[in-house]
Amino acid sequence: YNLIPNLTVRENIEVGAYLSDKPLDVNALLHTLGLYEHQRKLPNQLSGGQQQRTAIGRAIVKNPDILLCDEPTGALDYNTSKDILRLIETVNQKYGNTVVMVTHNDAIKDMADRVIKLRDGMIRKNYTNEQKIPAMELEW
């Protein structure tokens, strides 16, 4: 998750805030991420899902126009994966940024506005998803 091991959850997220001229409020974001109660913990004291949420928080706090998520559920169990997808969905709805998600999990496409499938570096499919499914309703 590329967290700085000797910094707390809050400090890891604040690193992102320092890199932005328009950062989000760290306290509000900690609440959105479900990490407010864990803000003083170090990364090695967190579960994999909490570490992933901290990494997402560090990216989101910069208030980017585009958020790139590369395999956001790759190393997580089913329930934690769904929690992370719900978090990404919530952040997208709350802050209005564009989310580009790269994944090998084909089921995740059902929550997207637009789907672009690649194979061997070539676009194989490119379509708008007419019937989006909320993250918590995805099954795989």
List where the protein language model places each region.
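Short coil-to-helix segment of the ABC ATPase nucleotide-binding domain corresponding to the Q-loop/switch region
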Residues: 5-14
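Hydrophobic anchor residue at the start of the ABC signature
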Residues: 56
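Conserved catalytic motifs of ABC-family nucleotide-binding domains
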Residues: 63
